[in-house]
Amino acid sequence: AVVGGGPAGIAAAYFLAREGAAVTIFEKEEKAGGVIRYVIPGFRIGDAAIDKDISFIQKMGVEIRTNTEITSVADLKAQGYDAVILAIGAGKPGTLKLEKGETVNALKFLRDFKANDGKLNIGKNVVVIGGGNTAMDTARAAKRTEGVEHVYLVYRRTKRYMPAAEDELLEVLEEGVEFKELLSPVSLDGGRLLCKKMKLGQMDASGRAGVTETADVVEVPADTVIVAVGEKIDTD
């Protein structure tokens, strides 16, 4: 049994089926595909790509049960499955608490963006906080959202230390997203995101330069602030 019908679950099912195992995928959504179908914007990868992979593994004999949420591995074992692979994805949002004002989670925004073809009411000025690939997708999607005029990518280190792939960042900049480095968000008030100016310090355990606060405060226009600071696996 494979729990989760996203890219990891589909890949696991493929390799297991190739070795002769009888595989069943359990997917809680209406269709398999995971983040590719429901979160990653169509300008990155279309549904046709994941549909092709799904069709391929089904022809190999993989069974896919949709609209089926699994809450107990023991129940699957009791049904006769010899092994269970959890491929549920990192869908638990990372959080960033501001002293004042509310933020929007990047995964929720991307899901809403895709479901509504970019027709969302998020104002003219959008700030995306984060430096990973999810932040890049979010910034590009925000730039394509109806009514948005300016998108600012706020990161507390410099470009050099961003975890996002270099080509991802280049695409973001080419599409007109404005990059604001060495800023740490503090509060959102009256259409302005107040940020502490940071400075690079000593290298930390991650191999990147650490950062420390300065006394300077920078304001960034913001009707909506979207947080993309790292997703986690929901082990609950």
Features from the language model and the residues they span:
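Conserved Rossmann-like nucleotide-cofactor binding loop
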Residues: 8, 30-31, 91, 134, ...
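Short glycine-enriched, charge-decorated loop/helix-capping segments at active-site entrances
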Residues: 39-44
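Glycine-rich FAD pyrophosphate-binding loop
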Residues: 19-37, 151-160
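Short amphipathic alpha-helical segments
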Residues: 13-15, 37-38, 96-100, 139-141, ...
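A Rossmann-like FAD-binding core segment of flavoenzymes
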Residues: 48-94, 108-122, 144-236
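N-terminal Rossmann-like FAD-binding beta1-loop-alpha1 element of flavoenzymes
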Residues: 1-25, 134-143
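Residues that mark the start of a beta-strand
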Residues: 1, 22, 124-125, 150
